[in-house]
Amino acid sequence: MTQAFTVVIPARYASTRLPGKPLQDIAGQPMIQRVWNQARKSAASRVVVATDDERILAACQGFGAEALLTRAEHNSGTDRLEEVASRLGLASDAIVVNVQGDEPLIPPALIDQVAANLAAHPEAAIATLAEPIHEVSALFNPNVVKVATDIDGLALTFSRAPLPWARDAFARDRDSLPEGVPYRRHIGIYAYRVGFLADFVAWGPCWLENAESLEQLRALWHGVRIHVADARETMLPGVDTPEDLERVRRVLGG
């Protein structure tokens, strides 16, 4: 029997490149409703939107979503997740999946996959997903987060830089991917054991996390194991810019 899990969708109004992003209309529905709809298609026993904005809260209540108004001063999405897990009274061994509020095209199967992976790997406190990198431009793009794992699928590290650096191959040619190096792009969906979240918040950011602007490095810094599996379905890009928004509108608007 698959372990039950809760989905939490953090949704902030403030966005440098796309203010009010969760409320942007996509084919007649606000983006946050699109994300919520996808999450509800998963096997989650509960789907909760976590927001720091009254406008988003009102919109969620309007279309029937369970939503919580959280504190505004959280340092990261995981810190916000810990507040929600605490307020919901989730048990320490419960699993919670963090689905980003700007992923209206997220496949429900990936939500189920990451939750099941964590349940199947008791040595890990976090599970996440990745997919192969096929283009050298993605490898050198700092907005594409790379991940390297050990033989058991546990993360060694994450970086915005090319990871690993193929010294000899790149000395000859940086216009193509080196042969024999399985480069992988991290997909930003996480499953957590609730008991881990309080530790994560109490630790505070580390210098490596700050340098890369990758909060999962805080967990690795403290020796926490992160299980990484290849995604079973393609994860289409989320919405970060007005151009992304128009692309998704075209996809969902038919």
UniProtKB/Swiss-Prot annotation:
GO biological process: CMP-keto-3-deoxy-D-manno-octulosonic acid biosynthetic process; lipopolysaccharide biosynthetic process
GO molecular function: 3-deoxy-manno-octulosonate cytidylyltransferase activity
Chief location: cytoplasm
Source organism, top-level taxon: Bacteria
Pathway this chain belongs to: Nucleotide-sugar biosynthesis; CMP-3-deoxy-D-manno-octulosonate biosynthesis; CMP-3-deoxy-D-manno-octulosonate from 3-deoxy-D-manno-octulosonate and CTP: step 1/1; Bacterial outer membrane biogenesis; lipopolysaccharide biosynthesis
Protein location: Cytoplasm
InterPro entries, per database record: Cytidylyl_trans, KdsB, Nucleotide-diphossugar_trans
Reaction catalysed by this enzyme: 3-deoxy-alpha-D-manno-oct-2-ulosonate + CTP = CMP-3-deoxy-beta-D-manno-octulosonate + diphosphate
Keyword Nucleotidyltransferase among UniProt keywords: yes
UniProt cross-references to PANTHER family, sorted A to Z: 3-DEOXY-MANNO-OCTULOSONATE CYTIDYLYLTRANSFERASE, 3-DEOXY-MANNO-OCTULOSONATE CYTIDYLYLTRANSFERASE, MITOCHONDRIAL
Reported function: Activates KDO (a required 8-carbon sugar) for incorporation into bacterial lipopolysaccharide in Gram-negative bacteria.
Family that this chain belongs to: Belongs to the KdsB family.
HAMAP family associated with the record: KdsB
Protein's name in the database: 3-deoxy-manno-octulosonate cytidylyltransferase
